[in-house]
Amino acid sequence: MTPPPPKRQKRDEYRKATAEAASQPGPSDVAEIKLPKKKYYRQRAHANPFSDHHLNYPLSPAHMDWSSHYPAFVDPDPSHTNLAGARKLLKDVEVVDIGCGFGGLLIGLAPLLPESLIVGMEIRVSVLEYVTTRIQALRAQQLKLRAATAAATAASETPSQQQAQIDGKQANANAAADAASPVLSTDTEHTPTTLVPGSYENISAIRSNTMKFFPNFFARHQLSKIFICFPDPHFKARKHKARIISETLNAEYAYALRPGGLLYTITDVEEYHHWILRHFGVESGAEEESEEKSTSANANANANAGVRELFERVSEEELEKDECVRVMKEATEEGKKVARNKGNKYVAVFRRKTDPEWPA
């Protein structure tokens, strides 16, 4: 049997060693806990959402086991289990990043929303493995920092040490405030030196095909925020059916999003931005593409009319005050690449309206 190429062997060995180091209570020095490197997690840019991937998904949201993803939020009462027999959490997942990629948005939102459970959904295997390993390493680093901080606090006895402790606490508080700001460094080679709110215990990632199984994970009105950042534009007309924004999927997002919840979108493709606006009923007068039939256009118009009753676009004034928008622009890997290339970023955020009343 022919062995795999040397590069593949090197990648597999690195990924295995990195995953083991991140998941085990290893070195005492924070600097020794390394974050994974992207070059060892090669993955194609696309995955066909219509293929029958080997995926694990719950029968319903009540069957989903979140305990392994958020161990710090597991209900201490072992008798509190869901329909699948898994331990329940103290709170529900309420923020979702659809197509989380390499996890830049998750890392940026973690200290900004320390009391909210955030999950990223990704269909590509290697990318998900990278994100999972990255989160485990960040949690391990925070654990070591907490232990080092506690030891330093206990060791301070003399007045000079107490004064140094006070100064150190003030410095840590300022650093933590900086860490909680939305402009975060997501360089995988960076080793944090301060504690961040939440210690990255509130983020995780799962492998899932959102186009098929989104309602299997989230109950009605469970979510407060949905992020769709730099989705695959699928430029060819015959590929438009694979876009993550459509009438059908928008209805599923509205089902899981609670009234007042926000759906964030950002793209660097202007045509796709207008597609998003049309499918949320904002650009109702836009002409459909020439190759589409009139019957399909009429059906889309009717669907958009229904979406218009469920979503309203958030004004630019509100977006300027929303810290999540800043993170979405600056913390994601695609956002950084667009900034390096001096490209444009098109943002549209939609608020979930209250469900319309049934006619009498």
Swiss-Prot record:
For molecular function, the Gene Ontology terms on record are: tRNA (guanine(46)-N7)-methyltransferase activity; tRNA binding
Disulphide-bonded residues:
none
Q: Which residues bind S-adenosyl-L-methionine?
A: 99, 122-123, 209-210, 229, 332-334
Q: Which of UniProt's keywords are assigned here?
A: Methyltransferase, Nucleus, RNA-binding, S-adenosyl-L-methionine, Transferase, tRNA processing, tRNA-binding
Location in the cell reads:
Nucleus
What residue stretch is flagged as signal peptide? none
Q: Which InterPro entries match?
A: SAM-dependent_MTases_sf, Trm8_euk, tRNA_(Gua-N-7)_MeTrfase_Trmb
| Protein name according to UniProt | tRNA (guanine-N(7)-)-methyltransferase
